Amino acid sequence: MRSPVSIGLLLLSGVSALACERAEVASGATVPAVSQAASDPVFDAQAAHELLRFVNQARAQAGQEALVLDETLSRAAEAHGREMLERGQLSHQFPGEPELFVRLGQRGTHFNRAGENVAFDYSVQHVHQALMASADHRKNLLDPSFNAVGIAVVWVRCQMYVVQDFAHQLPTYEAGQAEDLIAEKVATLRTQTRLPRLNRLKNPNLSGACSSGKAKPNRAALSSARYVLSYSNAEPQALPPIAGNVIGNGQMKDFSVGACYARTEKNPNGAYFVTMMFY
């Protein structure tokens, strides 16, 4: 299930090349003397790290945890920055380009929340100040739910396109690890309801089964269970509310669980598909 995507676009126009050069000299940053062809852009890693420093300073002042610069998110940001450079305009999604959740998921990162800032400006320091002065952009920069960011900066003459892709990244687990996390959650819920632990059964029809984005046991396996629960979530141990009813049922004695991880059209950011059987 996708969480809301937060996006923001910022265009600063009417800045002369001379003003741009003066601002960059004052901030100590380097501006390429010759613009790169749009088909072969050179991304400014130093400027990206400088932007990260400004972002994390602002987050520290706001009492928020620092963001980690993530390589997969940076690759996604660079790909979108290349699109903006080639088209000569700002956008969060061009015709034929996937939406943000898909773009980030295609790079292999696992997450459940995302946001994006894009801007066109003339210096690292100035673009950060402008983003912080805009409510929507500032919200992304200081969002406490984000823990990682990818940043791309590409110059065209003395001005730059900037992309900041934010995400709340989550750990990924092998099937067995995910199943163990779910089993631990079941044990915790049984303890909270003062019921004896359920005996966990190994079920080869469930373990690692993943078909079309669902953990699907065969019909024979299903017929032996008193209750079957299937769900999907970016975090396998985040059980749906209805799970509490069956786990808290004193008549249940045993259970088995199967989980698999997949990216689907509905879940481009990745999700665990889980089936639990109670006996």
Where are these regions (language model features)?
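Positively charged n-region of N-terminal signal peptides that target proteins for export
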Residues: 1-4
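Functional surface patches built around histidine and acidic residues
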Residues: 20-279
